[in-house]
Amino acid sequence: MDYKSAGVNVEAGRAFVNRIKASVESTSRPEVIGGIGGFGGFMRLPRGLEKPVLVSGTDGVGTKLELAQDYGSHYGVGIDLVAMCVNDVITSGAEPLFFLDYIATGKLTPEALTEVIEGIAEGCNQSKCSLLGGETAEMPGFYSDGRYDLAGFCVAVVEENKIINGSKIKVGDQIIGIKSNGFHSNGFSLIRKVVKLAGVNEKSCFGSRKVPLIDYLLKPTQLYVHLVQALLQANLPVKGMAHITGGGLPENLPRCLPDGLAASIDRNNWEEPSIYKWLRNEGDIPESDLWNTFNFGIGFCLVVSPDQSKDLIDMCSANGFVAWNIGQVEEQPKQMQSRIVGLPT
């Protein structure tokens, strides 16, 4: 008996590394030192920073991976992995520097995993961060053959005196919601149940344009890094930012607010994506569960002074993003434990 007969093909692993080399190298920033294959990745800090602070974030794609693998869609989840990490770290005003990935699988499937890496590289290129390294672990008996899990890790940098942490937010500030492009990478344990209950297959369509439902569900998570960097480079005084992921607006928006303040949301200020009507009807899901699970059409939020809200919305539009004024900051009602007002709890 040898390692290969036990289920681990070292030669296939080496071939896979060579296969993805071009995709990885396409993401390289000028600060990167050396190439892939070493025990660690090396990168200089960008020039001109006086008091640089590193910001780190890690995340996965969750059970969206199960649906993606069922339908042979691998490229998009690579973008998802980057977006889930990058969208988190940019809420501090930081610039993404590098990304690391971890892939665990029962049996190495080069075609599928190459698509994943190509998606990760695309996400990194959109974010202007380097795919500095990664690990692919073949774990027979732990994962089923052909199934895989993903984890990502991102490091960004920000000047210490430019960190955005919500500390300047005050009563009356406006909350700007940026449109999401779908479910992103949250709530898929519930979505998969509804998909099964509704008998969804490859031919199932959604909406007036008859978009394949699976394509809509698996649409890669929107990256907001280009927009945020454009806003900051224009010196728009953004006071706080929130990436709307698992837990929806009720859980994520308060994370950027100082103690004692709450977000008052007007649900009529943006159009609810029609997919939620389908989800409601097919899954018989309570309204509060929907709001506390999904982004409901808002993928990212920014908090600004009232006199800056129009300029911010206009700049979002100029950069290809739809934005709405969805509410304002208020004092947290003493009798309420929740720090969000106007949404089902």
From Swiss-Prot:
Its EC number is 6.3.3.1. Keywords: ATP-binding, Cytoplasm, Ligase, Nucleotide-binding, Purine biosynthesis. SUPFAM superfamilies: PurM C-terminal domain-like, PurM N-terminal domain-like. One of its GO terms (cellular component) is cytosol. GO terms for biological process: 'de novo' IMP biosynthetic process; adenine biosynthetic process. InterPro entries: PurM-like_C_dom, PurM-like_C_sf, PurM-like_N, PurM-like_N_sf, PurM_cligase. The keyword Acyltransferase does not apply. It is an enzyme of class 6 (ligase). Its main location: cytoplasm. It is found in: Cytoplasm. This is Phosphoribosylformylglycinamidine cyclo-ligase. It comes from Prochlorococcus marinus (strain SARG / CCMP1375 / SS120). The gene is purM.
